[in-house]
């Protein structure tokens, strides 16, 4: 599974969380750990891209005008 497949964001995020959990155990053989790490990087990039696309698509209707959604400065996602 890669971050560029047709799976949904939630499925990709769940898989990424599972990979992190498995890597954090420190009990994987080297080859499996490296493969999971690579998959995790691909999934993270895919999730990041989907979030950015969603952020760009969000519009806020204010004063009769559609405006782009601006992430609040203090939001954790605003640091991306």
From Swiss-Prot:
Catalytic activity of the protein = Exonucleolytic cleavage in either 5'- to 3'- or 3'- to 5'-direction to yield nucleoside 5'-phosphates
Q: Which UniProt keywords apply?
A: Cytoplasm, Exonuclease, Hydrolase, Nuclease
Q: Where is the protein found, in the record's own terms? A: Cytoplasm
The keyword Hydrolase is annotated on this UniProt entry: yes
Origin superkingdom:
Bacteria
Q: Which InterPro entries does the annotation name?
A: Exonuc_VII_S (IPR003761), Exonuc_VII_ssu_sf (IPR037004)
Which terms does the UniProt entry file under GO BP?
Answer: DNA catabolic process
A molecular function GO annotation:
exodeoxyribonuclease VII activity
Its GO CC terms? cytosol; exodeoxyribonuclease VII complex
Assigned EC number: 3.1.11.6
Subunit and partners: Heterooligomer composed of large and small subunits.
Family in the record: Belongs to the XseB family.
Annotated function: Bidirectionally degrades single-stranded DNA into large acid-insoluble oligonucleotides, which are then degraded further into small acid-soluble oligonucleotides.
| PANTHER family for this protein | EXODEOXYRIBONUCLEASE 7 SMALL SUBUNIT (PTHR34137:SF1)
What is the official name of this protein in its record? Exodeoxyribonuclease 7 small subunit
Q: Which gene encodes it?
A: xseB
